[in-house]
Amino acid sequence: MSTSAQAAAATPKVEISDLHKFFGELHVLRGIDLIVPPGSVTVLIGPSGSGKSTLLRCINELESIDAGRVKVDGELIGMREVERGGRTELHALSDKARAAQRAKIGMVFQRFNLFPHMTALENVMEAPILVKKTPKAKARERGIELLERVGLGDRLEHYPSQLSGGQQQRVAIARALAMDPELMLFDEPTSALDPELVGEVLQVMQDLAASGMTMVVVTHEMGFAREVGDQLIFMDGGVICESGDPVEVLDNPQAERTRAFLSSVL
């Protein structure tokens, strides 16, 4: 392996260092440190209000951070380092540079947020055309490919109101993939679905993980965490209480707060 290849392999996909986030006086994230290796699936679990979703939103700068650093592929998110007078200063990136960073990170939300006046295919085509200036014919070809990938090749011209919740969420995943992200973030993607529709979305996510996509997933689906996750992070009160191999954490949690949480959900 070449030196450059070794360096690339050693670079975490996501590196979070001493991350703090406040909402007013509420200290939501309290010094988070986290490494997400390339091609891995990191699953975040914990009670409501523990900071899981806020952490996700800080990774792609939907929320600004108050202290600490977030790097994706070794590149600071939202900031650049400037050497001045023997010390390193952090300066905010331009809006254009921040948008370019954000375009590399796909995110799927609890609510599908599809455009109701657009078909499934049009929803998937929209961002590549507007943001990446992809020719319409190429965006359409890619959109069809992605909708077929998530099992919706027969729903291209359906509007969101004509789709089930699970189908809408699969369109949302295809829409995120249309930007060719290097990292995918999922914020409780199945929590708004009827129980019988959860499996179809989890299957798409499992297939995506098998393809080598780096994923950070907030979920209450412990079966998914066990079967697909490479590392499991339990958060409570804005801190990481426990982390490790999903099977080990789920079957033999070491922290009392982890044990209490798992006993309430398993």
Q: How should these model regions be labeled?
A:
Residues 2, 234-237, 243, 247-266:
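C-terminal boundary and immediately downstream tail of ABC-type ATPase nucleotide-binding domains
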Residues 9-246:
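ABC family nucleotide-binding domain
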Residues 1-10:
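Short, low-complexity, intrinsically disordered N-terminal peptides in bacterial proteins
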